[in-house]
């Protein structure tokens, strides 16, 4: 995993969406709980957002579903946005100091009223995907 290529995927999604990073109120991290991957992803997210955006990983609930994880996490991210409640990363008690300066959602869920969210998936072999979703109105 490379922070540079992850950051590029995030930047492309933001640019394609036509919104700014300040409009995105939550990021669903790929977050596989691997040292190299999580550090790279958090650093890439910090680099692009330039602020401590709220972030958590849904894999802590169901593990890594391989090819299905992107679909599952995108759907769950949209559902959380609709409900204005975002799940924490389970069992995340200590943030590695090498991770990016982000607003890690831990302990309990959080109410966030946001019109835009991002879902990231950074897969084997450098297949990187970032999607921005807008609340349906």
Outline where the language-model segments fall:
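Conserved "HGTGT" condensation-loop signature of ketosynthase/thiolase-family condensing enzymes
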Residues: 1-137
